[in-house]
């Protein structure tokens, strides 16, 4: 009734009140335009091993690029602040201190971009070194996800350096905040409750019961993977299949960010195979060695709809801690194509 009176001229409004009403109606229209969809990105860059400051600059540049494209969830590759193939350099206190300084800078930088993003870094906690993903949004560190499954077969020897994720989450004092530390964490957007995010790291996906399965059963509709997966014959196709399958059986979107060729300085080759899948369908993936990012629109409300149809069973899985954040997802012109006869 009030709106009708305003437009009929029966009621006068102050200019600032009119502007507030206009902005509210515009915001509602934007939400309707992108209802249920979120733009996500699996991104990487040419990493400079042990050069934390240079890698920090490249992370910032990528975030600005994604922000300009309306990407709301940005996933970087495993250990991207230092590089994955660092071997004994991970023990160096100077390197670990540089990482903390870079994370502090990213904490403040996160105020200038409209997204939640995940950055891979080594962290020393209680005297142990962990392979971690740090979540940022709106000037806050939301949580620290820890890699649980550390490969020590064939060309891998991560268990020599890193400790596996503790069995239970706990809080750590980190950069002036109490931050949740573990892998049973789901990040929930309080402004868009269907947008719930789980995180795992590389090898965690390749085991019988990945952390992302536990996170999905605790409500995560978007699962992110920070990876450094090297190339051998036939591995790219297997990687594509495992990402697709994980998204299908958990009715989730899966955002897989893979380390790029900057890691190829030892006896391993990395190609930056970024993949985004939704409910078994590959929405976007990059060509090997292209150095490009994968960006796609995922329909989280569709995923929740599918789960309500098929998730009829009871699973005995651990409970995840829920961390809330406030993010107004970016408005964008939809580009996703749908089959007329699916």
Positions of PLM-derived features:
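Enzyme catalytic cores with a strong preference for nitrogen-chemistry domains
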Residues: 32-342
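Recognition helix of helix-turn-helix/homeodomain-like DNA-binding domains
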Residues: 1-13
